[in-house]
Amino acid sequence: MNQNQIQQLTSHLSQALDQNYDVVNMDAVLSVICALEGTTITKEQLEATRLAKYINQLRRRTKNEHLARRAKSLLKMWREMVGIQQTANDSQHHHSQPTSLPTPPSAHFYKYTAGSADSNLTETVVHLPVSPSVPSHRTISDLHSNIDSSEPPPAVLPSQHQSNFLNLINNISKCEREESNSSMLIQAHKQPQSQQFQNRPLGLPLPFISEQSLNSVSISSDVGNDKKGEASIVIDIVTDSDENDNESASTIQGKPTAAASAPFTISPAPCPRPKKFKKDKKHKERDRSKSSLLAQNELIGQHSSRYSAKVKEGQSQTAQATDSEIFSLSNSSMSSILSGDAALLNPQHKFRANASELTFTGRFKPVNHLDSANQDNSALPIGQNIVFRQNESERPIFEDSITNDSSTSCSRLSPPTVEERRKSDKIDDSIRQQIATSIQMPMPSIGLGHESNSRTEYLENSSKSQVPKKRGRKKGSKGVDAVIAKESSSLSQQIFFGVGSTVKKVKTTKELFSEIQSRKLITAVQSPTSNISNSSISRELTTRALMPRPTSSCSDTSIHSPQIMETYSGNVTLMGVDKFSNKNEDAGNTDSDTITSEPSQDSNKSQEIKECTSLDSNSNSLQTLSLAKKSMHTSKSENYSDVTTQLMHLIHSIKGPLSVYEVEKLYRAQIVPCTCLVIEEICNPFGEPINLSSDNGVGDPKSDSNNDNVSRHKKQEEQLPKLERLSDNDFSMDTPQKPVKSIFDLDFDEDEDPLQSIINDIRMPPTKLEETKENADLKNALAHLPMNISSLDVASVNADTVQNQINSHNQEGETSEEQNVAIPVFTCHEDPDCVAKQRFHVQTNKVNNFHINALHNFYIPNINGNWDSIDSSIVSESTITDFLNTLGSYTVTDGADVVPKYGSLTYDRIRKDLSSIKFTSSFKTRPLKSFMPPFLGVAKCLPTCRLARSSFKKKQIQSPPPPLIVIPSTIEGLDPDIMQKDYNGGSPLKVDVDVLVSGHDNNESNVQMQVNLQTKSDPTLSYNLLKLANDELPFEETEPNDKGSEYENQDNGRFSSSSNSSCSNSSNSSLKKTQDSINEKLRNQRSQRYRVQSVEEETNRKRRGKNRKKRNIKENPPIKRIKISLNGTISNLSSSNNSSSSESETETGLENENEVENDYENNNDEEYAVVQRPTCGDGASNNHIVMTIKKTPSKINSPANSMSATSPINASETRNVKNAFSDSNRPNLLTSSTSIAPLYQIDGGRRLLLSKKFSRRPHRRRRYRQCRRKSDLQRKAIDLELKHLFTYKTKPDLDIGSAIKLHKKLFFSHELCKQNTAGRKERILNYSSSSSSNYDDDESDLDGLSSEETAADLKENVNTFNKYNLNIETDNTSAERTVSEDPLKIEEDPYLTSSSNDVTDSDNESDNHEVFDEVAKRVEADEFNELHNNGMLTSFNSISVENQLINEPTLMAVSGSVDTPAPQSNASLASLQNENCDDVNNLCYNNNNLDVIKHSLAASPILNDINYKNVISNTSPRVLANKFSDCIPQNIGNSELSPPIPLPCAEYQTGIRPAPLTDLALSSYADFRCTRIQQFKEWHQVLQLQSYNNEPLIVLPYVVLE
């Protein structure tokens, strides 16, 4: 944030506050605080503005706690930024922490150095990097140590230290350094180090004294041996309060000989500062006194013997203390860093400098202690330097920095990083101090000792005079300014002599800032030349250090990172105007210099450091890098050649950021040049566009990055004239051709895009004016005038008028142009050969499967969940393959690791259109479980299904007489009203929608009842998962005594009774009309009776379960009484059990309905209601499973309430119809039912309805017959629990063989079959159809479907089970009707059609047999149609209606009673519309919850395209039927798998489809000439069904509830 912004924020804040700093404008205050919280601020900015004061006053004055907290946190953040935070306590804490932490690293490092120090300083350095504290910097430190024993410590130390040392060393020439260092290292380092190592415990970090002395020596050697002799002042960062400081002082004193011999040698080993305790203070004082004495002794000139002794005693300590001293930074950030080293030293060996020795920034100790110790100044300094460096590296820098620089947030840095930084900083500082000492006080080596002595004396005097004050004051820095001023005035003196011995408790922002600058000014202490050289060296070192030291930059608090803290005082780091500013790094470099608060002295160095630091967010790391680089350069000397080589290798191995050139090159390589020219047109006031051909700018060089800008510009220049001319002559060129739109483009049409109009407004008028002026042509004028002058009629205007208008227009245009001149108009002259444009078009407009697949499967770094490698080498990779090869690790093999394609995880892809699918698998093959789309189907609850099954079994047991079993039909037969009552009763599961075929046979209900008695032997037909309870009971319990025989008898009986089963359609319609009221009553009755039944059924079920087992029916314990009233199937079954005659069935049917009603009421759990429409006539009780998801009987009771209560057409009743077919009245019904069984056979592939045993194909009819017979037995066992569905049991029961093919069939054949009143098993479920058992008025439409489906079901059932004589909604009286329905179904339902003949042949040679033969023929043709159903139920096959060979009039006649009559019979359609509207609406379409297609309103259901259109158009299903019947012949013609044109979607649609008239024609239904239109509900809608009971619904695939 720049100064202006800060000023602006300050002004805003001041305006928001009143004179008393009370908030006037809270929003403004909050906005300012938010802005400040999100930015960094520098000390200068804070000082230049009153912002901090405002915030502080705001914090104090405001009563808003939140605001106060935010203001306080903001101030705290600033404090941290500027480094104010570091208080005496902080420093103490820092010291204490590092003391504990650094010890292990230092010990480790020490071990390393101890091993190698004697032999070679370079080795020592190499080992030093190993220290955990210097992970990234180890290499650097190693390089430095190798390069120069004095430099190695910086290398080992964090880059900050290195930079400091480098700065100190800058003056020394590389050669001199190398020579002096090598010699000194070899000489002094071997003996003293060996002694030191021996004396010093391994745990203690070796004093880096030797290393630093090497650094200093190298520097001094460069400068001259005299400088070496000079004692370097070591500023112990460890303040009086720190034990480490005391210890360090003691250490220094302990090493006085070494120090004396090599003043530089005494490098403050980073001594972690423990928290300042009183004892610490005491120790410090003692240490100070000791250190002063030692220093004096050293200054006096201690000889090698003394030096060796002291080195042994406290050389390590001294070195550490020296490090701490050197690094003693204001606020003791460096001291804390160094104190870690001291802490590493044994506290016994640690000496604390006297308070007098301490400056405010830290204690300054002469390096003289070691100077006198060395016999040979050069040798001793070298050894000392080596030792010092070793000590530093040994000392965990991070410990010191963490301990000392808690305020600087060194703790945030990882310990190793901190250590490294501290070490490097310490080494750098020691080197710098030594160098600075040698440079600034260049004295002969002899004089060095004296000078160091004098310095020591001065330090002692100053320390005495300046007793360190307790750092009790945590906040505030009163009096610091004066100290700072003094420090700044005598920066060099303070640095060397500790003039500011007073301890700074807390530095103000100014102080911190000045310190930072002063640290940057480290070289200022040194001679100006030395400063320059040092700065350059430090830059190099910093650069190098930066390379190896990403850690500092990586940490958020890199500014506060220990490295920075170490290099600079933690406060200094904070002080950096920029947390990541170079200043911080510079300060870090000036750890020893931090003492001085004046930034001015070291301006050169600070600038250089700043430059380096700008590279890295962490100034320290930046400095370190620069220092490292410098050190690398200096270390090119032979001595450091190894280290230098290593460092260079490391640096080079680390790829730096790409240069601008490289980036540009890479960018060009990846970019396709755009050769299109963009020309800026400036319109003169006259409107003449001036084309500024931005030859270079136009063709954006950036875009043309691949090509040289020159070449690109040339191309553009070549093209420009043409383009300009085009723009002048051809205005069209001005407007770029409209790009092909992508999905991301706006939706504006070409002419509607406002942008174009805006552009035209800006661009067009001038051009037009220009043309007008240039051409002065009336045509042009006229042409432009209409555009500009709307009122002008060019044709009628005279030339003068036109000219006048033109002139006026030109004037206006000029004015507008003048206004618009400011807006640049750019014209893009597209190059037809532009590669970029071609690529764009290809990428945007030519996306094909390849691209899509590539997008899904190819590796894209950040796309498709692929990880993106940050490896810099990847950047240069031009291709993915290269990249992958480079990585050699990640390769896309199978694409499994890439985002999967949509639906790839699904068990099976769900085909949206199954019409093209042909199921060739044998009818016996089990359909794959996965074949069932999980999301489609009737929502069923397993519990409900189990209940239904158990209740069904109970009812079967209870209802011994098959006629009784046929009770649902019987109920219908007994009284259509009663049946409707049952239906309307809408027991949750039992929804009986009995649509009598329009007045087919009233006696049909009776016949059906009888047939039901017979048909109840067909458990499979009754096995609607929903209706199983009712249907199976009729089937299975046709005669509980002999179910097996009964089934066969039932088939026959069905046919015989089918004639009776038909009820008058009129009665059905009337029943439907009264359904709701009747159903309510029936509901109550049923609930009562059903309760009784349920009890009886349970008892009977257990008994008859055995019989079922005989029939291969597994009895399941009744979980709950299933409230599925399959048209009173359950109740009917129980009553049928009681009565053996169809009459009893009729009676029991009523009772059963009542019971079923009761069951419904009792069983609120029922998720679905089977809507059965009583088939009075041919047992075509329009039974369809109504998805009554509502468990509450009240909701489900009424067909309207029940989700599927009103299924538009029950084509599925065909199985019930089969039972009805078994009516005695219709001997042919057996045939039809047999033909229906083939339906399953035909379905072979689709065998949804058919059991495995059924083949889809007519040629397998015999097989189907056999299978039907077998499956009749197997049907007995119906798995209402859907166990087979979930367990994928092939046979839930032998009787459920058809059920096995769940996935091919939406429902099991038993599910689809219900016994008609005639006792015939009708297909209960017209998946999309309402009950179509009879061509009832209620469901003439539905009946058509049901008849089709029923025929199909009959075929299925007949083929599958003779018992399943599906008389498709044919009157029981007329086998023909049944047959006709069956043929309808057979044709529509390929299953039925294919197997109808066979079934007819095998099962029953009734009158219907002929009909079934016909049907079978049709079925044969319709095998393909069954394929249309795609393994769906025949009802879906019926949807295809490909088999609708029935004449449209016949269909209409047949469906006349059905909801939708065939369109051909308009009169019947009209009547049907009237009747069916009521019936279908009441029954079939009452499924409001299911969005059932209302006969006229059915817009949502889509059966066929025509039906769908009609439905959408709200045309009545009858009209749809008419249209559909028109399509039916076509569909019939298309007997293959492909459904008729509307059919392809039929499976998915709840459409109204006319039942094939052919089937109807076969029976008396043909006489009705009603086209039954079966309405299917879109399976999508089925998916939407929800369980009102919150009970998970099992959704069977493709079940149309309606």
Curated annotation (Swiss-Prot):
Q: Where is the composition biased (Low complexity)?
A: 1056-1070, 1124-1143
What keywords are annotated for this sequence in UniProt?
Activator, Coiled coil, Nucleus, Transcription, Transcription regulation
Q: Name one GO cellular component term.
A: core mediator complex
Where is the sequence biased in composition, kind Acidic residues? Answer: 1144-1158
Q: Does the keyword Lipid metabolism apply?
A: no
Q: Which GO terms describe its molecular function?
A: transcription coregulator activity
Q: Does the keyword Coiled coil apply?
A: yes
Instruction: Give the location in the cell.
Output: Nucleus
* Annotated Basic and acidic residues bias: 418-431, 715-728, 1073-1083, 1378-1388
Purpose of the protein: Component of the Mediator complex, a coactivator involved in the regulated transcription of nearly all RNA polymerase II-dependent genes. Mediator functions as a bridge to convey information from gene-specific regulatory proteins to the basal RNA polymerase II transcription machinery. Mediator is recruited to promoters by direct interactions with regulatory proteins and serves as a scaffold for the assembly of a functional preinitiation complex with RNA polymerase II and the general transcription factors.
The family annotation for this protein states: Belongs to the Mediator complex subunit 26 family.
**Subunit architecture:** Component of the Mediator complex.
Q: Know the name of this protein? A: Mediator of RNA polymerase II transcription subunit 26
